[in-house]
Amino acid sequence: MSSIHDLDFIKEKLEELKKAGVYRKLTVLESPSGPRSIIDGKEVINLSSNNYLGLANHPRLKKAAIEAIEKWGVGAGAVRTIIGNMTIHEELERKLAEFKREEAVLTFQSGFTANMGVIQAVVDKGDVIISDELNHASIIDGCRLSRADVVIYKHSDMEDLERVLKEVKDKYRVKMIITDGVFSMDGDIAKLPEIVKLAEKYSAITYVDDAHASGVLGESGRGSADHFNLHGRIDIQIGTLSKAIGVVGGYVAGKRELIEWLNHRGRPFLFSTALPPAAVAASIEAINILSESDALTRKLWDNAKYFKEKLKSLGFDTGKSETPITPVIIGEETKALEFSRKLFEEGVFAQGIVYPTVPKNKARVRTIVTAAHTKEDLDAALKAFEKVGKQLNII
């Protein structure tokens, strides 16, 4: 006799994924994250990492992490509101606030939990969130948890955003516009100057998730607010320590009063053990490196421009990308996954992205070049893209 504990309903859902050709297993990395990585015993050019600046295996970050373990141990031992708040946590937040040119910063365990915690702490029932339709899943989940009404506007469509703002103008206590700074699947940049003007016109709060802009846009990677010279005009900025910074964690930057409030009402902050000392120390060292020089961000953009232009010249559809995130849009889901598999056979790891991560018929292979890639790496990858693209009649 079958039991509910057999989880037959889950097995059926897994079978549906397999029949649709979109079932996947986790890739196992057998080396540090870098421009070339070892997967299944094979060295491949890595075009799927968020390690934009190559800091994840940087000797200065590793040294800082090791020294922190020797001094502080491997864990904080408690939430920060009890006895897990170490001096290095405070130091990291000071460094981040200076780097972002904001009054204060509060760190979280990830960018995902930062979005979930901040949104639900800032808005509530009787408020409204106005969210771009392509915002990250963590924003979507944060909106759901907040109990506020949510209105979606068409992606980067300022006319539609203004239409929504007019509709909600006198209906809510707090109005908050939320957007990614850089959109993770298409690589386009939010129209922040226009969003800020509309927010000021209609008395709305602005909230920007800079996960893919931190370390990428602006002076030495200070983010999208710096990129557009909007310091002091964006109310809430979310950042991550897990991508360009090369470590793990997330943070929110803004006014001191905002950070004080989140100290009291940011649930993931309140109920999760503090970031481990090694991660904190490595993040501090990453900020030090970025503050000293813009060499890594310049190399990142040189590589991104070169790779994107070459892909376009081969005939690939790279959509509306403006950043080191460059999608190769295939359309059909099974074909995108096959494209990814064949690239791996040619020594290139570039992840196939399918529904529900992207809309149906918009499947793609998403590439991210880094500052650590050499021109030889990129040329070898381009050769593989050309070969597989012709095999599958994509170009």
From Swiss-Prot:
Xref: InterPro entries: Aminotrans_II_pyridoxalP_BS (IPR001917), Aminotransferase_I/II_large (IPR004839), AON_synthase_class-II (IPR050087), AONS_Archaea/Firmicutes (IPR010962), AONS_Archaea/Proteobacteria (IPR004723), PyrdxlP-dep_Trfase (IPR015424), PyrdxlP-dep_Trfase_major (IPR015421), PyrdxlP-dep_Trfase_small (IPR015422)
Enzyme Commission code(s) on record: 2.3.1.47
Pathway noted in the entry: Cofactor biosynthesis; biotin biosynthesis
Protein's GO biological process: biotin biosynthetic process
List of residues binding pyridoxal 5'-phosphate: G111, F112, S184, D209, D210, A211, H212, T240, L241, S242, K243
Keywords: Acyltransferase, Biotin biosynthesis, Pyridoxal phosphate, Transferase
Domain of life from the UniProt record: Bacteria
Catalyses which reaction(s): 6-carboxyhexanoyl-[ACP] + L-alanine + H(+) = (8S)-8-amino-7-oxononanoate + holo-[ACP] + CO2
Gene Ontology MF annotations: 8-amino-7-oxononanoate synthase activity; glycine C-acetyltransferase activity; pyridoxal phosphate binding
Broad enzyme group: transferase
Binding-site residues, substrate: R24, H136, T357
PANTHER family noted in UniProt: CLASS II AMINOTRANSFERASE/8-AMINO-7-OXONONANOATE SYNTHASE, LD36009P
Family the UniProt entry places it in: Belongs to the class-II pyridoxal-phosphate-dependent aminotransferase family. BioF subfamily.
Function: Catalyzes the decarboxylative condensation of pimeloyl-[acyl-carrier protein] and L-alanine to produce 8-amino-7-oxononanoate (AON), [acyl-carrier protein], and carbon dioxide.
Subunit details: Homodimer.
Name by which UniProt lists this protein: 8-amino-7-oxononanoate synthase
